[in-house]
Amino acid sequence: KDEVGVYDSYPNANDLFIDFWFKGDYSAIFKYDTENNSYLRSMGYDENDNPIPHADQDTKEQINVKNVIVQYVTESPIPNDPKGRLDYELVGSGTGLVFIDGKVIDVTWNKEARDERTMFYDSDGAEIQFNRGQIWVSVVPDRNIEQVVYN
């Protein structure tokens, strides 16, 4: 989308915390940068409990994206896998959150087949209009919804 203000009626959400495995090295933190209308990503915490900026390997700059999706999915063990790996069900439908323009939108998602695009819809059934630019998708097991916190 190119228009500003499309989602002004939705609640503000400047900070997003996704604490995988109960806070630690794998925690994802997104802070809304009003100046650039983007989200700065950090990963994990330092010894003083401050988020560690997640730097792009090539540019060495902190990762920033225009849209963040939290997609809740069903997680299950892969049968007979000797390493105990997990499967995340990405085909089908579910719920999630979209963070865009400093706002948060409760969404539903639908993906008809493995080679199809995942579609995201607001509570009225309208397709989400994402900002031009990067989209970061955080796939979160639906049993861990309480570990996704925003304000």
Q: What kind of feature is each model-predicted range?
A:
Residues 1-151:
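A surface/extracellular/periplasmic glyco- and lipid-processing/surface-interacting theme
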